[in-house]
Amino acid sequence: MKKILLALLILPCVSCLNQTVNMETTFLKNRTFDEVWEASIKAVNDIEFTIDSIDKEAGFIGAERGRHVLGGDAPPRISIMVKEDDRNVSVDCKVLQKEQFIDVLGMGKKIVREFMIALNQNLN
């Protein structure tokens, strides 16, 4: 019985880990690509991320925050895609943790929310 209980306690600890990904998309009407692009850059800076990759033609912004979580080197990475179609502009915000970090505290969802709030503030 003790061996079964021990196995049940250890099994979750040795299971395969997936990289933590949190994503949200917002659609903005009556905004130009350039307005949303500039607001997105400001929003990334407002939430204290450092932009390390940017391509306006592709609509891509990549950034990283240099924080260490729980004594480990697992800074979150954010990827922003700004796209324009006939009627509106969309913004995809994706946050992922490097090095198979488990997002126990829900940091990824919080970062997505912070970015979306900062984006809306910069557009108003």
Language-model segments: which ranges?
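Ser/Thr-rich, low-complexity intrinsically disordered terminal regions
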Residues: 16-124
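Sec-dependent N-terminal signal peptides
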Residues: 4-14
